[in-house]
Amino acid sequence: MSVVVANLSASDDYFRFFGLNQQFNIDLPALDQAYLAIQREVHPDRHARGSDSEQRIAMQMATLANTAFQTLKNPIQRGLYICQLHGVDAKLETNTAMPAAFLMKQMEWRESLDEQEEDLPALEALMAEVEESKAETLVEITQAIDGAKNYQRAAELLRGLLFIDKFAVELDDTIAALI
């Protein structure tokens, strides 16, 4: 159980668990490889003949690997996790305050969606705009976390990204219904 034993002490930091640097802009193929290596080590079939304690540790490690992988794979969850590691709670449930310009843009998008819900080219153009905004926000988050180490600012941007992501899903559903 070499990987399990080696990584058990790193279970308090998902980045260390996978042998990655703690940063927002991560090497996703390296994350995939590390995850698969750990999963091969801790797969229940490999420990079926082990002691109860070995089986339990393997199961705990498999669960931890899944949770850590899902967290780091998703940019929003990864950003929130990094903020949390640095003592910043994004307060997603209670803090919905956003800058006025951001709220205006959200209202503009929502009005466009309502007014053009049957106009596929207009909806696709709106989706391109939303995706561009998402990409710009991801760049800002990367700068806030990896560059400035400003986790409070990153948390604010992540709250905005959640709004953008939610709207993008709604817009995508509307487009899918037309196709």
Predicted regions and their residues:
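C-terminal accessory/regulatory regions appended to core domains
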Residues: 1-179
